[in-house]
Amino acid sequence: MTSRISHSSSPSPSVSSVVRPLGSVSAPAPALFAVLAPVVLAVFLGFLSISIPLGALALEVRDHLGFGAATVGWAIGLQSLATLLTRHQAGTLCDQRGPRFAVLLGLPLTACSGLAYVLASVLPLGAATSLAVLIVGRLVAGLGESLFLTGLMSWGIARVGPARTGSVMSWVGIAIYAALGLGAPLGLAVQPCFGFAGVGVIALITPLLAWAIALRLPAVPASGGPQRVPFHRVLGLIWRPGLVLALATVPYAAMAAFLTLNYAVHGWAHAGTALLGFSAAYILVRLLGSGLPDRLGASAVAVGSLAFEAVGQVLIWQAGTPAMAVLGATLTGLGFSLVFPAMGVLATRSVPPEQRGRAVGNFIAFADIALGVTGPVVGMATHWFGIGTAFLVGAGATCVALALLATVRLGRRA
């Protein structure tokens, strides 16, 4: 799963350090967009495969296989952990063999995750074996995402030049959240008619379509850039804004894993509407307000954004109607959108210019950690206290993030 920064400064010399696009949205020239369009479309199709199973997988693991909420959390969160653990290797491969190689390897691997979903659904396997096959699919999807996203980001930057890195980040970020917003409702719509196997078929086909697009794009040289600065050397400079980012990611991760189950517990239909509201608000705010951290100050924007997130999570927690849950999800997306660029500004200003791109790559890892850890941890909480606890935890995380903003300012002065 999983986060983006508004960042207009020069990128790192090693494009492998730019793994999750985080950019301020600007309207590129038509010629620029024509060059980026195949890359953006490939990202969109690749991430459809990532997002389509999210809501449907929760129902498959709980209702069909008979496992509890904690297992649901693990099944969903393991993909993000796999993405985090393979991020460095994917970047190294991209540098050594070129972006095209990474993309053409990563997209078929992502398609294999869809195949695993199909096999787990149609083969006469026991519940534990089916779950194991699903988990293998999730792990393969995590590796595939690391490869194709790193490669497509690097490919896009190489095609338009480092001066247009911000435009590449912006459009790729929008493609990712458009896919996340459309994928989950699509999966939930397909599942009642064709079962989870139908969801798996779509998750198999979409990355292959992206692979066909990538196959037609001209290759660019491998960067062969310098070694990346070790994470621990940058960690001391960026951990405060990074931790705020991680805490702000908890509500999104909780919604991805448990919003569908929350709807089911209440007997409501159309959980995908709430997820669509989240993504629509995220994209709209990113398009219209990406310059606010520069104009109003990163900390001020982050405070307002986190407040919206907290209110949204409380609304979902206390929702007595589907409309209230949709409103809560929409407010969560509205707030989540600008936490990334705001904290990204603080993180990149905390390091020397020559390490700024590396700081971006390591900063994004905080969101990966949150995406991977939230599902299992919140799953255990919901097992003891009910599904609604997931959103209470999300609200609490944003409140802790608000408190941490004071230490972010202190850390910058120190």
What positions do the PLM features span?
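Helix-to-loop junctions at the C-terminal end of transmembrane segments
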Residues: 86-98, 285-298, 382-383
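C-terminal membrane-cytosol helix-exit motif in multi-pass small-molecule transporters
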Residues: 204-223, 404-409
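C-terminal ends and interior cores of transmembrane alpha-helices
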Residues: 108-127, 308-320
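Helix-loop-helix hairpin linking two adjacent transmembrane segments in secondary transporters
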Residues: 171-215
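Residue-level signature of mid-helix packing/kink "hotspots" within the transmembrane helices
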Residues: 80-88, 180-181, 282-287, 372
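Cytoplasmic helix-loop-helix junction between adjacent transmembrane helices
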Residues: 137-175
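Helix-loop boundary and gating motifs at the non-cytosolic
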Residues: 34-75, 80, 244, 252-262, ...
